[in-house]
From Swiss-Prot:
It is found in: Secreted, Cell wall, S-layer. The S-layer is a paracrystalline mono-layered assembly of proteins which coat the surface of bacteria. The lineage of its organism: Bacteria, Bacillati, Bacillota, Bacilli, Bacillales. Its main location: secreted. The keyword rRNA-binding does not apply. This is S-layer protein 1. Keywords: Cell wall, Repeat, S-layer, Secreted. GO terms for cellular component: extracellular region; S-layer; spore wall. It comes from Bacillus thuringiensis subsp. konkukian.
Length: 43
């Protein structure tokens, strides 16, 4: 039904947003620190 399809689409979008958010956080952490070393002391 249309309702089920709508909820499926919303769920998929929610997962995509959550995944993107997690990826962005991971990327930021990688930028801010290299192997646990603060960016200020990294090369």
């Amino acid at each position: 039904s249309a309702t089920v399809e709508l909820y499926s689409n919303l769920a998929a979008k929610g997962l995509a947003v959550e995944f993107t958010s997690t990826s962005l956080k991971a990327a930021l952490l990688n930028i801010l620190s290299v192997d646990g070393v603060p960016a200020t002391t990294a090369k």
